[in-house]
Swiss-Prot record:
GO terms for cellular component: cytoplasm. InterPro entries: ArgE/DapE_CS, LysK, Peptidase_M20, Peptidase_M20A, Peptidase_M42. This is Putative [LysW]-lysine/[LysW]-ornithine hydrolase. It comes from the Archaea. The gene is lysK. Disulfide bonds: none annotated. Zn(2+) 1 binds at H66, D90, E139. Signal peptide: none annotated.
Length: 326
């Protein structure tokens, strides 16, 4: 039996390894060494993902968390029962939860610590493991929450070139790009089933014979959305959702109730590796993990240690439910 203190110390050490996207190697080495300490072989795949396999009973379950964080170092400390640090919520708390659920469960589990989730999900897109029966992705849903849907993510580049005319007439490239943005933004709404977005890059300047402008936008897309074919698409990950009646969802509902909580099924307006891994393997995928997602990417990122420890037990019980019902 692994002690509470050991589980807290593991998470603290994991968060202390600063790992913005592209610099996940320190976390990878730590995970591989930690698995080996518990007698489980782990290795790096071709893109830098950490893979560990636990043999047991029941269906094959993929536990996929990510090792990278957004930039912005936060001094790591424990105060009032909370662990502060970059990645404590997004998503090293869930990753540590997956680590201990793998160690302590008597089930067929593939653990995957993925790279580049905060970038273009290179880790998920290039993951090559045997087809699982169920996929659980490590993202903060709250101890009593299960995320059953995420909006899609569409990154598009628009460019405009406008021949020079007298300054008192016509519009330049910047104005045309602004018109394009306003046309798109007319379709924005709130919630899971609406389009939303923001400008992530905008440059415009004068050249010798013309005006040039470039705008890159990121749109969060609802289920069923397909972009116009003429757009210059940099990256597109469609929306994803799983049925509330899925055996995977029902297993978590039972496990959360067993812990004394009322389950909350969530659909989020962000995007996660569920959007890639669910369609990639053609099986149901949800996201689960401790932490308040409102603290993602903020200077105030912190996780309640009690919730982290509870999430490990809930995840283990959900895995047990899946294994028992196979």
């Amino acid at each position: 039996m692994i002690s509470t203190e050991e589980k807290i110390e593991f998470l603290k050490r994991l968060v202390e390894i600063y790992s913005p996207t592209g610099k996940e190697n320190g976390v990878a080495k730590f995970l591989i060494k930690s698995f080996e300490n518990y007698g489980i072989e782990a290795y790096l795949d071709d893109v830098g993902n950490v893979i560990a396999v636990k043999k047991g009973k029941g269906p094959l379950i993929l536990l996929a968390g990510h090792m990278d964080t957004v930039p912005g170092y936060i001094p790591v400390r424990i105060e009032n029962g909370e662990l502060w640090g970059r990645g404590a919520v997004d998503a090293k708390g869930p990753l540590a939860t997956f680590f201990f659920a793998t160690i302590e469960s008597d089930a067929n589990i593939i653990f995957a610590g993925l790279v580049d989730e905060e970038g273009f999900s290179k880790g998920a897109k290039n993951l090559e493991v045997p087809k699982p029966d169920y996929i659980i992705v490590g993202e903060p849903s709250g101890t009593n929450g299960v995320t059953i849907g995420y909006k899609g993510s569409l990154t598009v580049k628009f460019t405009e070139t406008v021949e020079k005319v007298h300054g008192s007439i016509g519009v330049g490239a910047a104005e045309k790009l602004i018109e394009k943005w306003l046309t798109i933004a007319k379709y924005f709404g709130e919630g899971f089933n609406s389009l939303s977005g923001r400008i992530v890059k905008f440059v415009a300047y004068e050249r010798e014979f013309d005006f040039f402008g470039e705008m890159i936008v990121n749109l969060r897309t609802p289920p069923g959305y397909m972009p116009p074919k003429e757009w210059d698409i940099i990256d597109f990950v469609p929306a994803y959702e799983v049925s509330r009646t899925s055996p995977l969802v029902r297993a978590f509902v039972r496990a959360i109730r067993k812990a004394g909580y009322k389950p909350k099924l969530k659909k989020k307006t962000g995007t996660a590796d569920t959007n890639i891994l669910g369609p990639k393997y053609g099986v149901d995928a949800i996201a689960y993990g401790p932490g308040d997602s409102k603290l993602d990417h903020t200077p105030y990122e912190r996780i309640k240690l009690r919730e982290y420890l509870e999430a490990i037990e809930i995840l283990k019980n959900a895995i047990l439910e899946l294994s028992s019902n196979d």
